[in-house]
UniProtKB/Swiss-Prot annotation:
This is Probable nicotinate-nucleotide adenylyltransferase. GO terms for biological process: NAD biosynthetic process. One of its GO terms (molecular function) is ATP binding. The gene is nadD. CDD domains: NMNAT. Keywords: ATP-binding, NAD, Nucleotide-binding, Nucleotidyltransferase, Pyridine nucleotide biosynthesis, Transferase. Catalyzes the reversible adenylation of nicotinate mononucleotide (NaMN) to nicotinic acid adenine dinucleotide (NaAD). The keyword Nucleotidyltransferase applies. It comes from Chlorobium phaeobacteroides (strain BS1). Belongs to the NadD family. Pathway: Cofactor biosynthesis; NAD(+) biosynthesis; deamido-NAD(+) from nicotinate D-ribonucleotide: step 1/1. Its EC number is 2.7.7.18. It comes from the Bacteria. It is an enzyme of class 2 (transferase).
Length: 198
């Protein structure tokens, strides 16, 4: 089994996350996608509660699976109640799914501090890594710039040209803006019904 792993805060999930997952299904030739709502040790604590972020990740998976089962959510990280490192998640999933054929999907914002990650060299050695960019006019979106930053060629870079940011969406939601165009409909409905990010 070829497994893709997409971890993130998902605070909240947006259409950029959805596009990344759909790209993985259609073009990366992986059998299954595991979405993991994480507590990133290198970022501020998420604004939404873990249970809400896991639920929104589940709604993201349901949206992806409307055209066939592909994505599922792991709550292993969120249930541990403290930050978990990516290498720990990958090793856990290797054991659970009995496969070492894992591909790590990360956003370019997280990639920029990749060398601060625990065991980042081991991640490169053991797993395929695909970095997804948000927009083409960002200087960091150039393949050569990313290669220079990491000094390694064992990854791919794919630019989705979707300049969406959960941080910016949270700010807009706190100001009372309507962000329904940037967020998958079931997730938007959940945010409104549960009065998140107000």
């Amino acid at each position: 089994m070829r497994l893709a792993v997409f971890g993130g805060s998902f605070d909240p999930p947006h259409n950029g996350h959805l596009a990344l997952c759909l790209y993985a299904r259609e073009l990366l030739q992986v059998d299954r996608l595991v979405i993991s709502a994480s507590n990133n040790p290198l970022k501020d604590a998420p604004q939404a509660a873990d249970r809400d972020r896991v639920k929104m990740a589940e709604l993201l998976a349901e949206t992806i699976n409307r055209t066939g089962a592909f994505a599922e959510v792991s709550s292993w990280e969120a249930n541990r109640g403290h930050p978990v490192y990516t290498i720990d998640l990958m090793e856990y999933l290797e054991e659970i799914y009995s496969t070492s054929d894992l591909t790590l999907l990360i956003g370019e914002d997280n990639f920029l501090n990749f060398r601060q990650w625990k065991s980042w060299e081991e991640l490169i050695r053991r797993y395929s890594i695909i970095v997804f960019g948000r927009k083409a006019d960002d200087g960091a979106s150039d393949d050569s710039a990313i290669s220079e930053r990491l000094h390694d060629q064992s990854f791919r870079h794919i630019d989705l040209n979707l300049p969406l940011s959960s941080t910016e969406i949270r700010k807009r939601l706190a100001s009372g803006d309507d962000c329904s165009a940037e967020i998958p409909s079931p997730i938007w409905q959940y945010i409104v019904e549960n009065q998140l990010y107000q």
